[in-house]
């Protein structure tokens, strides 16, 4: 049986979407499989309102807007997109891989690019006994829109770029914003930290939340304890947003019959994004190699590399890739 697709991209986050588009430019028969009901991966599911500053050509763009632009880019080619289709198994070999999804549907592909990001993800939850009582009421781990916090007092817990970005996004919308971190120094990029310090966001360091309670007026009362100290403070807020990061795992890949070698839950690749399984490449946050940066911008560079090396392996008689202007002049 001949393979239905030249390339199957497993993972429909921004990097997987760009890989599918670029494969379309190479006239490949492309399938894009995404486990979630919509494209965009973690950016769409967790950070739709986050302002992204490190994508070339965009001084600033919201996560959802970046995904929308990538979707628009995809429509230029006949990409077969399958949503809500987590891949449960891969069998076969280069030239005819069989890919099985959770619904039992099978497809055949000559080669595969894995772009599953960090895999399945769960937020690192607040380690307070009664925290679950307040989840999705006054305690949030990710939010669909900052508008829900208009004219409210909000505390953001966390010390990385995501927490800082969230606090800065809330600043013009909320009545008052606090940010609390367990260390005196934030882990975010220097420019973001400078913006935070220059903003009206009130900084609480070095503190950890120890207790949650509801006040008589319906607010959320936080009891905060100084790290390596004895000071305790209480603070009443309308909402608490916890940005402690996510616990991610690509364990589903380890259950495939054809499994690339992994190191610390990430797939190891060479300079051409090849795994140790012929015909399977991997890109984005799912991979590790010397000098790897966990940036969307890095993944956008890895995608054409992976597509080109697989297409040249499958179709050595084809010409080397052309510049995009040449491709679109013919359309």
Curated annotation (Swiss-Prot):
FAD binds at residues 34, 42, 47, 87, 121, 285, 325. Keywords: FAD, Flavoprotein, NADP, Oxidoreductase. Coiled coil: none annotated. Binds 1 FAD per subunit. It catalyses: 2 reduced [2Fe-2S]-[ferredoxin] + NADP(+) + H(+) = 2 oxidized [2Fe-2S]-[ferredoxin] + NADPH. The keyword Oxidoreductase applies. Its cofactor is FAD. Pfam families: Pyr_redox_2 (PF07992). GO terms for molecular function: ferredoxin-NADP+ reductase activity; flavin adenine dinucleotide binding; NADP binding. Belongs to the ferredoxin--NADP reductase type 2 family. This is Ferredoxin--NADP reductase. It comes from Lactiplantibacillus plantarum (strain ATCC BAA-793 / NCIMB 8826 / WCFS1).
């Amino acid at each position: 049986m001949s393979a239905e697709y030249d390339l199957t991209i497993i993972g429909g986050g921004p990097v997987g979407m760009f890989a599918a588009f670029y494969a379309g430019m190479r006239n490949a028969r492309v399938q894009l499989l995404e486990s979630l009901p919509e494209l965009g991966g973690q950016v769409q599911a967790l950070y739709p309102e986050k302002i992204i500053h490190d994508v070339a050509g965009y001084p600033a763009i919201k996560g959802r807007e970046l995904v929308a632009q990538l979707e628009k880019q995809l429509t230029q080619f006949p990409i077969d997109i399958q949503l809500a289709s987590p891949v449960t198994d891969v069998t076969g070999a280069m030239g005819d891989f069989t890919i099985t999804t959770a619904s039992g549907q099978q497809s055949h592909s000559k080669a595969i690019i894995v772009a599953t990001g960090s895999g399945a993800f769960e937020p690192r939850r607040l380690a307070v006994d009664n925290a679950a009582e307040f989840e999705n009421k006054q305690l949030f781990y990710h939010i669909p829109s900052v508008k829900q916090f208009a004219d409210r007092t909000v505390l953001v817990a966390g010390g990385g770029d995501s927490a800082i970005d969230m606090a800065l996004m809330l600043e013009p919308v909320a009545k008052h914003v606090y940010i609390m971190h367990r260390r005196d120094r934030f882990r975010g990029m220097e420019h973001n930290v400078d913006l935070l310090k220059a903003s009206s966001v009130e900084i609480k360091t070095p503190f950890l939340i120890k207790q949650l309670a509801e006040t008589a007026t319906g607010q959320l009362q936080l009891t905060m304890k100084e790290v390596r100290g004895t000071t305790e403070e209480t603070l009443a807020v309308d909402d608490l947003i916890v940005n402690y990061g996510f616990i991610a795992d690509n364990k589903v890949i380890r259950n495939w019959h054809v499994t690339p070698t992994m190191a610390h839950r990430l797939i190891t690749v060479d300079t051409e994004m090849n795994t140790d399984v012929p015909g399977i490449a991997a890109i984005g946050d799912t991979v590790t190699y010397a000098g790897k940066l966990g940036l969307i911008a890095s993944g956008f560079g890895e995608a054409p590399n992976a597509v080109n090396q697989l297409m040249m392996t499958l179709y050595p008689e084809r010409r080397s890739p052309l510049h995009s202007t040449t491709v679109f002049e013919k359309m």
